Regions:
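Extracytoplasmic
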Residues: 24-25, 36-122, 130
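Outer-membrane beta-barrel transmembrane domain signature of Gram-negative proteins
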Residues: 361-384, 557-624, 739-792, 798-802, ...
Length: 965
């Protein structure tokens, strides 16, 4: 009844307005103009349906309109008797067609009228399934349309090729849509996830294909047709995709879980909140390898989350296909009444053309992604209680320590509702089934290593305060990379800042930091790097209304080291472990602008001291996602040593090709949150500016030029000295034959070094130069290569030269070999000795790295990894920081021989059987070493000795099995 009254009032208002307007100039209403006839027909059909349902008399026509260089397909509404074109335009604008405009009848010449209803003949290269960026631009370039009449479509149902869609809005000329997903009972579906998409129920589902080229970000229609189908049940979402493509162009390769390689794949990103809070992304490679992770607004990707889902691929005569089953229970689905909106993006990697398709087809430089996803309207999806128990058992045989160990424990997860999720681990075994990279770091700055343990990764996004707590975000910001897999992926990490975060869970169960040693006792070689066992850990996360929260606690077992006394005898070193706790709460207001306020606190209790840190954070994103502001204010530290800190980040994305970032840091001399967080240094104030620019078309043979210009200045707060300053330019460009050239140049003005002396004064460093160049070849070939060179001016003005080369060899789908070799010839290399002293060295550094992967099947992998770092350095000068400070002066040597060597080895042979999601069997052999200085040894001797007398020599067998819904 209410709907009928509303419609009557609407029609009465329309006729009143029409009668008053009929005396206006006669003419036509134009809804839009398109290069593509199919898109014009789609709009015409939707408008015709709207006119009829609204009772408005009129006829929809499509006519050709010739511009200077282009033929446009113009959508006209010819008003019926007693109705003016201007009244129709007004109602069109109220209905969402804000770009409708008036065309006087005197300006309409006889032109060819075209059919409104499409013939539905679709070519794979035609833009039949969405408004491409070119079509949207065409609405602004109709020869008779003014700038004020430019608009896109809003909230009107449009049948764009296959699958009914509603156009919501656009970003940078790229549209996003809403679709309706059909819901079935799980018992009705009966889909076997085998990648074939051949069950009868799939044929009852409308396919969607609205793919545009997102990498490189041309926004052009996809060359090859894709058909995506979605089915929702009370248990999860089924995704079926058919990728049409000539069979001879398919690239099928196997890879490990979450390993990003150049291969054909398809994927989907889901924001189950529908509010742009966090996205879950899933990909299946042709070859059945799987990748998943989370993405925080806007493109803060994290690959360190693994969910229990299914995915398979299948080769067809006309291309390939794939299927996924994504359980709702593994995602934090909020409560909602009735139908819910879920954000989504579909994607497809076409390896042979080095393109990534996506719907919506935003480039990787767009201002918004997570907050501007497509929307799917889904009925019957309710949060499900999730219970899972993952018991595990492990056996370790340590040959180096002559010790055997057996361990059993369990991970437990219980999620009764979206408001709360409880997870716990009892007697966990974080055995070394993953290895860190071998790094040479002889400075006073700590090296950051990412978390790899599943328990600490699950649900960790609530504890992320600033985007730059994530290393992948830092890399993307400073390189402007779009993660193209066109060429072998090699990057320079020189002058990349470390993350800053109050929570670095690698501290939990990591190397012990509060061990009291008796006089005359020191840790035996390698003991300081031994991880600490945990009694257990627990985590509580959830959401209540607009408030998200998280609590984490963990308890270490006693520390057990092997020590040695002055005569070389070994003794046991035992001490209590540490306890850790964190608390996080954040309130989010999601409207036209997005605003949030949060609190994060951490506590570490140890046998020697306690450390407590508190912080407040605030965040703002404007309606278009172009302006983003993040701020965090910090107070705390160790007992009686509390300090203050602040971080402010501002990003302004002017367009898809140009953006600006400003970062402000302030950390006073007392702030220190490294007992649980990560901060490379304190006592500084820094300003960093980053301008990112990209240009797709650079000429007949060059494309996708991407660059950043970085300027930064840092001051020591105690003395007001400039302790870091630099101007850096980084860029990459696509060359012919799928090659990529990456370049970097930096100029570092005169500054003072105040950290490396470990509190013994500052010394002046003259201005310096850095340059790096890397060429990478086609990653789609059986063998792809990279070669590079670089130079760096050292603190004493001498030069270090770097040369590197690498190869990836894939002779068959199920095997890959990666080998990289890095060589540095150092001159004038300043290395800290003790007290106020430094040595200047010349020397050589070799760093080979080898990875061999053999995939017996997608579920069975054998991997051999080898990393070694060898250094031979000869002292050629001895210096000391002057007592008055500010300069290095020549000093007397404190030893007869200050030469040194470094030999660090990590080797692992690992078998993994992925029995089911989160159910694995690992059999691992680890061998590693860190040799003391051997003055007379050659590089061959250093490598041989690292193998022959290891400090790590262990076999590990570990089985975990997941039980749950």
């Amino acid at each position: 009844m209410r709907f009928g009254c509303f419609k009557l009032v609407f029609l009465l208002g329309f006729w009143l307005y029409a009668g008053l307007s009929y005396s206006s100039d006669k003419g036509y209403a134009v809804a839009g103009s398109f290069k593509s006839l199919t898109n014009a027909q789609s709009m015409a059909l939707s408008i015709d349906s709207w006119l009829k349902s609204s009772g408005i008399p009129g006829q929809v026509e499509i006519e050709e309109s010739a511009g200077k260089t282009t033929i446009w397909n113009r959508v006209l509404i010819i008003p019926g008797d007693g109705v003016s074109a201007r009244s129709v335009i007004s109602l069109l604008k109220q209905g969402g067609y804000a770009g409708a405009w008036f065309l006087p009848s005197s300006r309409v010449e006889p032109k060819q009228r075209l059919p409104v209803r499409p013939s539905f003949v679709q070519q794979k290269t035609e833009a039949t399934d969405g408004l491409s960026s070119a079509d949207l631009i065409s609405q602004a370039t109709d020869p008779e349309q003014t700038v004020e009449q430019v608009s896109t479509l809003f909230d009107m149902p449009v049948a764009l090729g296959q699958g009914t869609k509603t156009l919501i809005d656009q970003q940078d000329g790229i549209p996003r849509h809403q679709i309706a997903v059909r819901n079935f009972l799980e018992s009705e579906v009966k889909i076997k996830v085998d990648g074939k998409v051949d069950e009868d129920i799939w044929q009852r589902i409308e396919p969607h294909d609205n793919m545009l080229v997102a990498v490189p970000g041309t926004g052009a229609p996809a060359e090859y047709k894709s058909e995506y189908r979605l089915i929702a049940t009370e248990k999860g979402l089924y995704v079926g995709a058919i990728m049409y493509q000539p069979p001879e162009t398919l690239v099928r390769r196997m890879a490990g879980r979450d390993q990003s390689i150049d291969v054909d794949n398809f994927g989907i990103t889901l924001d189950v909140s529908g509010e742009g809070l966090v996205g879950y992304w899933f990909m299946v490679n042709l070859g059945d390898s799987m990748m998943d992770g989370k993405v925080l607004p806007e493109r803060n990707y994290k690959m360190d989350w693994d969910g229990p889902w299914l995915g398979k691929s299948f080769v067809r005569p006309d291309g390939w296909s794939g299927e996924m089953f994504l359980p709702w229970s593994m995602m934090n689905v909020p409560s909602a009444k009735g139908a819910r909106n879920i954000g989504f993006a579909a994607s497809r990697q076409v390896s042979h053309s080095a393109e990534r398709y996506q719907w919506p087809g935003y480039s990787y430089s767009s201002a918004r992604f997570v907050t501007a996803l497509n929307q799917m309207k889904v009925e019957g999806v309710e949060p499900k209680q999730q219970v899972s128990v993952i018991p595990f058992a492990s056996v370790t045989s340590d040959q180096a320590l002559e010790d055997d160990d057996m361990k059993a424990g369990a991970d437990v997860l219980w999620k009764p509702s979206p408001k709360i999720q409880v997870s716990a681990t009892v007697n966990p075994d974080f055995g070394a089934v993953e290895v860190d990279d071998v790094i040479l770091n002889l400075t006073a700055m700590e090296t950051y290593f990412p978390e790899k343990r599943l328990f600490f990764l699950e649900g960790s996004e609530v504890f992320d305060v600033l985007p730059r707590s994530n290393m992948s975000y830092i890399m993307k910001t400073l390189t402007n990379d779009d993660w193209s897999r066109r060429s072998r992926r090699v990057y320079s990490r020189d002058f990349m800042p470390s993350p800053i975060s109050l929570i670095n869970t690698r501290r939990i169960g990591g190397t012990a930091s509060q061990v009291a040693l008796d006089e005359g006792v020191s840790p035996f070689r390698g003991q300081r790097d031994v991880p600490t066992d945990l009694y257990g850990a627990a985590k509580l996360t959830g959401q209540v209304g607009d408030v998200r929260y998280g609590v984490l606690s963990a308890f270490e077992d006693d520390v057990e080291w092997i020590g040695q006394i002055e005569d070389g005898s070994k003794v046991d070193v035992v001490g209590p472990g540490r306890d850790f706790a964190t608390a996080r709460v954040i309130y989010e207001s999601i409207g036209e602008n997005r605003k949030s306020l949060g609190y994060l606190g951490t506590l570490v209790q140890g046998p020697i001291y306690d450390a407590e840190v508190h912080s407040l954070d605030a965040h703002f994103v404007d309606a278009e996602g172009r302006l983003t502001v993040d701020a965090q204010f910090i107070y705390g530290g160790r007992e009686r040593e509390e300090g203050y800190g602040a971080l402010i980040d501002m990003t302004y994305a002017k367009s898809a090709t140009l953006s600006h970032v400003v970062e402000i840091d302030y950390m006073d001399e007392d702030i220190d949150f490294n007992d649980l967080g990560f901060l490379a240094r304190n006592n500084y104030a820094r300003l960093r500016y980053v301008m990112s620019f990209n240009k797709l078309d650079m000429g007949p043979s060059l494309s996708n030029y991407r660059s950043t210009l970085i300027a930064e200045q840092q001051y020591n707060l105690d003395d007001g000295l400039v302790t870091d300053s630099g101007l850096y330019w980084r860029s990459s460009i696509f060359l012919p034959r799928r090659q990529t050239l990456r370049m970097g140049v930096g100029y570092m003005p005169e500054r003072f070094e105040d950290i490396d002396s470990r509190g013994n004064g500052s010394y002046q460093v003259d201005d310096r130069i850095w340059a790096d160049l890397v060429l990478a070849t086609d990653s789609g070939k059986v063998a792809s290569y990279s070669i590079g060179m670089g130079v760096l001016q050292e603190h004493l003005d001498d030069w270090t030269v770097n040369a590197k080369a690498g190869v990836t060899y894939r002779p068959v789908d199920w095997m890959s070999v990666d080998f990289d070799l890095d060589y540095r010839q150092r001159n004038g290399w300043l290395v800290y000795q003790a007290g106020r002293n430094f040595g200047a060295y010349s020397g050589s550094e070799w760093q080979p790295k080898l990875d061999i992967n053999w995939y017996i099947s997608a579920a069975h992998q054998i991997k051999l990894s080898f990393q070694w770092l060898g250094v031979k350095a000869n002292e050629e000068g001895f210096y000391s920081v002057s007592q008055s400070g500010g300069v290095l002066v020549a000093a007397d040597r404190t030893l007869d021989n200050h030469d040194f060597t470094v030999s660090r080895l990590t080797t692992q042979l690992r078998y993994r059987w992925e029995i089911a999601p989160l159910t694995d069997l690992f059999i691992v052999y680890n061998r590693g070493n860190q040799l003391p200085t051997q003055f007379e040894s050659s590089f061959d001797d250093l490598l041989t000795d690292s193998f022959s007398d290891p400090v790590i020599d262990s076999f590990i067998a570990k089985l975990r099995y997941r039980f749950g819904n």
